[in-house]
């Protein structure tokens, strides 16, 4: 059985821009920055002679984002970035002040789908933006504990 959510892996094309987004703008702490290569790595991911720079950026609850920039294989753009595309769609972070986050990130050129919106059915505000490579990132500000999250 699964005991805990650990991380989300994000393939990036410019590690420095991604570190700026996830660490400088969102406040993740850069935990490690290393090169992954060798037989183990290539076998694990199914790419011959793979090498990648990996940065793990953590949140206070112990989960982290694993940023991966391949140095031996060209990054393949997704077939679509539409919200209804099948598969892993977005990563979501809980934040304390979504309006301030939106203002700060917008002023730094981050593209948002919309301003933060109040949910019609839960005491939350939420919005989506795009990271430097177009990955959808959601933010949620929770005004009061959600009953279904308490169980």
Regions found by a protein language model. Give the residues of each.
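Vicinal oxygen chelate
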Residues: 12-16, 59-63, 69-136
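Short, solvent-exposed beta-strand edge segments and adjacent coil->beta transition regions
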Residues: 3-7, 52, 86-90
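Residue-level detector of high-confidence beta-strand sites
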Residues: 31-33, 115, 139
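A generic structural micro-feature
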Residues: 2, 46-49, 82-85
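Core segments of cupin and vicinal oxygen chelate
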Residues: 11-62, 100, 107
């Amino acid at each position: 059985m699964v005991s805990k959510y650990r991380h989300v892996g994000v393939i990036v094309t410019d590690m420095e821009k991604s570190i700026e987004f996830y660490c400088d703008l969102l406040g993740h702490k850069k935990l490690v920055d290393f090169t992954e290569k060798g037989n183990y790595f290539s076998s694990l991911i199914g790419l011959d002679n793979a090498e990648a720079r990996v940065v793990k950026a953590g949140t206070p609850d112990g989960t982290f984002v694993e940023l991966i920039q391949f140095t031996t294989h060209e990054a393949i753009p997704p077939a679509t970035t539409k919200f209804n595309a099948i598969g892993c769609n977005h990563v979501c972070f809980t934040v304390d002040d979504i309006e301030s986050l939106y203002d700060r990130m917008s002023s730094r050129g981050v593209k948002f789908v919309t301003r933060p919106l109040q949910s019609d059915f839960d005491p939350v505000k939420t919005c989506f933006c795009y990271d430097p490579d177009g990955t959808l990132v959601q933010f949620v500000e929770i005004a009061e504990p959600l009953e279904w999250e308490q169980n």
